[in-house]
């Protein structure tokens, strides 16, 4: 097993996750099995109770793990399925050690950060690195570990010490450290400054880790003189200084690393069992990046949500929209609309914001209402849903978005004026959305219906069934406490709101479609968590197709992706060029 540790310096949020994912991508393109671990030095057990404003979205895994959004990057880039133990937090490791102490495993010893916490970290990493994450079930050969935060943070000290010891435990030829640092370029001088990187590497080396690669994040490509300066002061060769400058799309980052000889370096440094050959998977990334840069037509989607001021709150939703837009050869324009701005109360208090929000909504090609919690902004979302329904605008509601679509339909079509979710109005006489039986009140963490669940299609001719390739069932990830009241199903269906997908027991409403509408769909699950760049999520893909007016034509042609549209580079084909000529997204004609 080979371990690659990715650390960060100067500031957080400079793209360690994308760089770690890109390193995994180029290694996977060489035919290796790659897994990933994200370490977050906060004391929370998991990301389940985080505010989206503070930490971005909560990413949900197959096993129901609520984890950091960086694990979403790993899954999308590498097309793997991770588990909750691939996200290690200070809280998890302390809980693990304290539980062992309570059981008497330490035989009365004084339990300390060193050696007990640091040993537990190393054991966790070595154990988790061996868990298969690919569909073929084979054991990984490389584990990419991202240490969150920045070097020098007091929270990350136990992890730095653990990896200082770890590099000797697994031997130098099996361990490599990539340090990601910022090279700022003040506009006043236009000169690239290396001092922050020098200080960051000096601090890391003082803690016992010496970087093998220094990855410099910068606005523009590094000058040769700057590269040589970093090489001299950071104790690395010039070819070990890697420049990752701002690029048009993140699809270019793996290509950027490949061009600078990162694979050749790993080949020598870690003695990896790979051959120098043309790599099909990277060709697919290059093809995607080139397509992305050549897009001319634009499709605009109004994202009506509660957390629109911080785009990371909807990271996977945005990625799913981007994947689908690329598949239909359109640039994506997302119009972020704070749902409270659409409410009548805003018209009285801030009329300019109200009219600007409605202007954005009316000018969009399609409307998306994503998941969320809490009553604030729900009436604005209902207003947007009502507008999309009446104006025949393509609409997709995800989780809360689906629930509010049912509330809107109940109020404005069935005439139940007080129809609501019991989450917002426990005393409503028409509880169209109710608390779930699985929910255990009183404890915030882990009380929802989480993880991958199966949904069965109830009819042969629904739009969603066709988008999923005319299959009998689908498996998607869930994260919700409330659901559509099954008692009211008949009343809603009689008026044209069809529940075309239900759970295995037939008790939970999973997919809803409105008759006589170009595309009005609600899903209780979160399809964005399984969207991939080459395999866009069917609900989002349907929304984009409908938004550009091509859905009917696509449904007539049949909806299967090419079997070659996968990430696997272990197909045994000796002709990557022939595969690349067949790389095609879902077939869309220009009419």
UniProtKB/Swiss-Prot annotation:
The keyword Lyase does not apply. The modification N6-acetyllysine is found at residue 100. Belongs to the CTP synthase family. The modification Phosphoserine is found at residues 562, 568, 571, 573-575, 578, 587. It is found in: Cytoplasm, Cytosol. GO terms for cellular component: cytoophidium; cytosol. This is CTP synthase 1. Pathway: Pyrimidine metabolism; CTP biosynthesis via de novo pathway; CTP from UDP: step 2/2. It catalyses: UTP + L-glutamine + ATP + H2O = CTP + L-glutamate + ADP + phosphate + 2 H(+). Its EC number is 6.3.4.2. NCBIfam families: PRK05380.1 (NF003792), PyrG (TIGR00337). This enzyme is involved in the de novo synthesis of CTP, a precursor of DNA, RNA and phospholipids. Catalyzes the ATP-dependent amination of UTP to CTP with either L-glutamine or ammonia as a source of nitrogen. This enzyme and its product, CTP, play a crucial role in the proliferation of activated lymphocytes and therefore in immunity. GO terms for biological process: 'de novo' CTP biosynthetic process; B cell proliferation; CTP biosynthetic process; T cell proliferation. Residues 569-578 have a biased composition (Low complexity). HAMAP family: PyrG. The active site is at residues 399, 526, 528.
